[in-house]
Amino acid sequence: MKKNKFQIKREATFESFIDAGVNLLIDRAYDPVSVEDISRAAGYSKGAFYVHFVSKDDFLLYLLEKRQMKKKIIIGYLDQMERESVKSLTLDEAAKHAAELLYSYYINKPSWDITSFAMNMPTYKVLKKCKAYVRLYELWVEENVLYIKWLKERKLIDACIDPEYTAKIICAVLDGIIKQSYVLGQPATFRSFLDALSVFFTLDREHERPRILKSFSESEEHQ
């Protein structure tokens, strides 16, 4: 059935709100963003927002459930670095660039805080009604899965490394680093971010070169 002009316009407006929400989520986290901010970013009035969504919580549900939010933040940046350097990145270079990107978010966009999702989950009321924030954190894990797969495709890490398990480890380490910085009142450092993103390898002191760990998977956890 052919859509009329009203339906087409309504769908376009809806998509504009969703796109604006994705960008605000990445740039500023979600808690400090108001309905006015979302409407302004989408190019519409606050009234237009309420035509499509009941509340900000309702909007978050649509944002997470109706749109795949894999923005490929990390691997997109690594691809860009490879194009600019006109050569393949080494494991050390890839880890440094990934840490550079995430640390810049941490420093320049404090409200975004990589783990703001996890830190705010216990108090944010939407969690009591749905699992939207859990999904938000899962999407962050998926970003790191893509990062690990990117490294594996280039044979920079051992093929037997489990992307899903290791991505959770990375997120857990980054969570701890940022939460610890709040508890101790000391800013996280670039070095700590680099360490979190370099759990795949250590240095072979005898030959002074990166030595890839045999594995980082659940299957070998108790061996």
From Swiss-Prot:
Which PROSITE patterns does its entry note? Answer: HTH_TETR_2
Which of UniProt's keywords are assigned here? DNA-binding, Repressor, Transcription, Transcription regulation
Q: Where is the HTH tetR-type domain?
A: 11-71
Which one of the record's GO molecular function terms can you name?
DNA binding
Q: Which Pfam families match?
A: TetR_N
Q: Which residues bind DNA?
A: 34-53
Gene3D superfamilies with a match to the protein in the record: Tetracycline Repressor, domain 2 (1.10.357.10)
Keyword Transcription regulation attached: yes
Gene Ontology, cellular component aspect: protein-DNA complex
Q: Where are the transmembrane segments?
A: none
Q: Which PANTHER family match?
A: ACREF/ENVCD OPERON REPRESSOR-RELATED, ACREF_ENVCD OPERON REPRESSOR-RELATED
Protein name, UniProt field: Uncharacterized HTH-type transcriptional regulator YwcC
Organism for this UniProt entry: Bacillus subtilis (strain 168)
Q: What is the lineage of its organism?
A: Bacteria, Bacillati, Bacillota, Bacilli, Bacillales
Q: Name the gene for this chain.
A: ywcC
